[in-house]
């Protein structure tokens, strides 16, 4: 932590706080060293608190079943999403807090979930509202009521391919768009 405080814009105290979140996520020392660079780069680029950024990254990586060494890639995805949508890293982190456990369990990619959250942010649905809404939609489609299933069948909406494997999130969105696109208000 002291070395990072001396060689980056973050203080040793900031670095220690970030590492505390990593430790709470169960990261070992090697994991912390693998992950800290991506987390610091994201926090610096987004002008966000290092501890908060570490919490966002560690929680999301855990939910998606990713490794500490994936933190740089995840940071890049979040930075791109926040740069291309009406949101920021902190709000995306709030969204991920709610949707990541469900999306990760359904094997959806960080990229697809970030894209969906960015689109929602552009429609003024942000932070915990976006995360909760997306989580609820995914959970409902994964285990629909009989009435929901009847409507999904009627409009050709499915989360799975013919062989039972999950469709990608992008395929689900395209499926929703084509199935519901002709409906009027």
Annotate each language-model stretch with its function.
Residues 134:
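Conserved catalytic-loop aspartate of Hanks-type protein kinases
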Residues 111-118:
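EAAAR-patterned alpha-helical heptad-repeat segments
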Residues 1-73, 80-92, 103-111, 123-131, ...:
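A short, structural motif
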């Amino acid at each position: 932590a002291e070395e990072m405080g001396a060689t980056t814009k973050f203080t040793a105290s900031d670095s220690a706080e970030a590492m505390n979140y990593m430790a709470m996520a169960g990261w070992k020392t090697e994991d912390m060293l693998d992950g800290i660079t991506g987390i610091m780069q994201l926090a610096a680029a987004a002008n966000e608190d290092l501890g908060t950024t570490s919490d966002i990254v560690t929680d999301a990586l855990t939910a998606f079943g990713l490794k500490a060494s994936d933190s740089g890639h995840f940071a890049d995805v979040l930075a791109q999403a926040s740069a291309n949508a009406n949101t920021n890293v902190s709000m995306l982190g709030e969204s991920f807090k709610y949707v990541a456990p469900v999306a990760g369990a359904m094997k959806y990619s960080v990229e697809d979930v970030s894209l969906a959250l960015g689109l929602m942010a552009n429609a003024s649905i942000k932070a915990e509202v976006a995360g909760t809404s997306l989580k609820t939609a995914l959970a409902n489609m994964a285990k629909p009521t009989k009435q929901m299933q009847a409507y999904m069948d009627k409009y050709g909406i499915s989360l799975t391919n013919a062989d039972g494997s999950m469709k990608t999130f992008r395929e689900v969105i395209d499926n929703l768009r084509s199935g519901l696109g002709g409906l009027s208000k």
